[in-house]
Every structure is written in C-alpha cells, then in structure tokens.
Amino acid sequence: MIKLYNFKTRGLGVITTEALTKGFFIGSYMKKNINQSSNSRLIYNGWVETNPLGRYINHNRNPNTFIKEIGDSLNLISSQKLDAYSELTINYLDVAKILKIPQSRLKELGVDDYDYIEEEIDKVINLI
C-alpha cells in the first residue's frame, strides 16, 4: 500500500502503491509509547514509526493525511482521494499540537511558525 521513494530534489518520502480513498486508514501508533524524548524525534522525522516507512512521511502545509486520535491510538488517515504513486504528506505542526509539544521545544528544533499552528490547527480538528 505504501513504499519508500527517493525524490531526486527532496530526498526520501513515502508514496502510495495503489489509489486510496478519502478517509483511508494508513497506519497507527500507540500514544502511550510516545515519551518526552521521542516527541522531538516525531517532529524531526515526521510521523512516528507506524511501520519502518512511517518516519519518512514528509511535511506539507497542505497535507493529504491527518492524525485522528482515538483513545491511546494516533491514526494516520488520508484526507483526500489519492492516486496510486502519490506522495503522502503530514503537517508536522499539527502533530506537535496534538501531542502538546511546547513551543520552546519546537523552537529548539527550528520550527518557529507559531502563527501558522494556530491558524491551521482548526482545520485538522474539524477533520477529526
């Protein structure tokens, strides 16, 4: 369903190997396994390792996936219909907000577009 792909201009990312419908479940991670130190890894690498490929999902301000939190599970869901061989993207700042990562920690990681977090997070919350 997904595989690692080396984009010549952007490096590694994850693509679909088949078409996915809007709302398609891609993978999940148990939130209880995320501790403070792995939070920074999540933001740095993107998505937590739902499988070995999950960490390569790239950031995009207009992502085609989102996180749906159900109990202790963080589920990666397609937010739109995707053609086969589409790159999967996630908004790292939305993930940071869901995990309640402090702005000070984001700043240490070089993420400083806080106004964007506040403007865009409502869109994700409405999808969940």
Show the residue positions of the predicted features:
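Conserved catalytic SET/PR domain of SAM-dependent protein methyltransferases, capturing the structural core
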Residues: 1-128
